[in-house]
Amino acid sequence: MKKHPSSPAACPCGKPRAYPDCCGRWHAGALFLQAPDAESLMRSRYSAFVLDQLDYLLQTWHPDTRPSELEPNAADVKWLGLQIKASQQQDDTHATVEFVARLRQAGRATRLHELSRFVKEEQRWYYVDGDIR
């Protein structure tokens, strides 16, 4: 089920901008799927996870590694924040982003620490895969 923040709430990605002016512009509208760099795509994907925007997640996942489907968040999942540890562009079409995403599920806090790989094809950035840290 797609969720959108009500009113101009802060973007889930943690940047000090309203969602429509931050990740929301990559999720819908004229700039749909047009994140300009790997870090912006990473932030927009985190926001999409928070908001259960599964179609966006699938469309920004590289076709070679994309799962056939994704499950929405369990009812007891609450995303708590995103921290970008490092963002590095190797060349014009390859980049990595290291991040820590914090969440709580069934009352238990957990962290996902990943080094993600991204590739740019036909003027679009895609998530390829990542190594859990």
Swiss-Prot record:
InterPro entries: NTF2-like_dom_sf, UPF0225, YchJ-like_M. Pfam families: YchJ_M-like (PF17775). Belongs to the UPF0225 family. This is UPF0225 protein BB3385. It comes from Bordetella bronchiseptica (strain ATCC BAA-588 / NCTC 13252 / RB50) (Alcaligenes bronchisepticus). The lineage of its organism: Bacteria, Pseudomonadati, Pseudomonadota, Betaproteobacteria, Burkholderiales.
